[in-house]
Curated annotation (Swiss-Prot):
Lineage: Eukaryota, Metazoa, Chordata, Craniata, Vertebrata
Annotated signal peptide: 1-21
GO-annotated biological processes: negative regulation of BMP signaling pathway; positive regulation of neuron differentiation
Gene3D superfamilies: 6.20.200.20
Name the UniProt record assigns to this protein: von Willebrand factor C domain-containing protein 2-like
Biological role stated in the UniProt entry: May play a role in neurogenesis. May promote matrix mineralization, but has been shown to weakly, but significantly inhibit BMP2 and BMP6 activity in a preosteoblastic cell line.
Subunit-structure text: Peripherally associated with AMPAR complex. AMPAR complex consists of an inner core made of 4 pore-forming GluA/GRIA proteins (GRIA1, GRIA2, GRIA3 and GRIA4) and 4 major auxiliary subunits arranged in a twofold symmetry. One of the two pairs of distinct binding sites is occupied either by CNIH2, CNIH3 or CACNG2, CACNG3. The other harbors CACNG2, CACNG3, CACNG4, CACNG8 or GSG1L. This inner core of AMPAR complex is complemented by outer core constituents binding directly to the GluA/GRIA proteins at sites distinct from the interaction sites of the inner core constituents.
Localization (cell): Secreted; Synapse
Length: 222
């Protein structure tokens, strides 16, 4: 009976050793994700501190070597403490620039606005246009629109009218003035009633007509 127990103990001692050496694998007991990532990083990205510099694509540069870290970066020099990059004073971008590229150390304007925008419409440089009958405008090289409003002369009548597509009022019936509530033409004497003859002041249409009484020609009553 004692012999059987001893043999059993020997089997128990041997079996764990066999399992450890033959059956255990990394697939059965995977390592922690953090340990795997750290291990992979060490394999892919070597530590070049104090030895060189690495750009965005993983290319290694020696100490003292000049390189561009990325397609839109300023040039750098690989130093002991890491890249030392230029910081130039870039030219200002034109305020009318419509397309800016960042493919170098400084941004570059590739397309400048070459038109003017006015009330939702675009006009070429130096193009003249009339947004209304009374306005004359031009697209300046500065991409700004300058407009001038028509300076209309004072009409020589008391009843001017506005024609379509014309800015300034016109006197369809020529110069005139008021004689009381009656409009009379300028340049002649006009009998406005049985007793009064009136005429407009020369050039002063806004003044009331000058009138004089004559012998009344109305019917006399007894």
């Amino acid at each position: 009976m004692a012999l059987h127990i001893h043999e059993a103990c020997i089997l128990l001692l041997v079996i764990p050793g066999l399992v450890t050496s033959a059956a255990i694998s990394h697939e059965d007991y995977p390592a922690d994700e953090g340990d795997q990532a750290s291990s992979n990083d060490n394999l892919i990205f070597d530590d070049y501190r104090g030895k060189g510099c690495v750009d965005d694509s993983g290319f290694v540069y020696k100490l003292g070597e000049r390189f561009f870290p990325g397609h839109s970066n300023c040039p750098c020099v690989c130093a002991l403490d890491g890249p030392v990059c230029d910081q130039p004073e870039c030219p200002k971008i034109h305020p009318k620039c419509t397309k800016v590229e960042h493919n170098g150390c400084c941004p570059e304007c590739k397309e400048v606005k070459n038109f003017c925008e006015y009330h939702g419409k675009n006009y070429k440089i130096l193009e003249e246009f009339k947004p209304s009958p009374c306005e004359w405008c031009r697209c300046e090289p500065s991409n700004e629109v300058h407009c001038v409003v028509a300076d209309c002369a004072v009409p020589e009548c008391v009843n001017p009218i506005y024609e379509p597509e014309q800015c300034c009022p016109v006197c369809k019936n020529g110069p005139n003035c008021f004689a009381g509530t009656t409009i009379i033409p300028a340049g002649i004497e006009v009998k406005v009633d049985d007793c009064n003859i009136c005429h407009c002041h020369n050039g002063d249409w806004w003044k009331p007509a000058q009138c004089s009484k004559r012998e009344c020609q109305g019917k006399q009553t007894v």
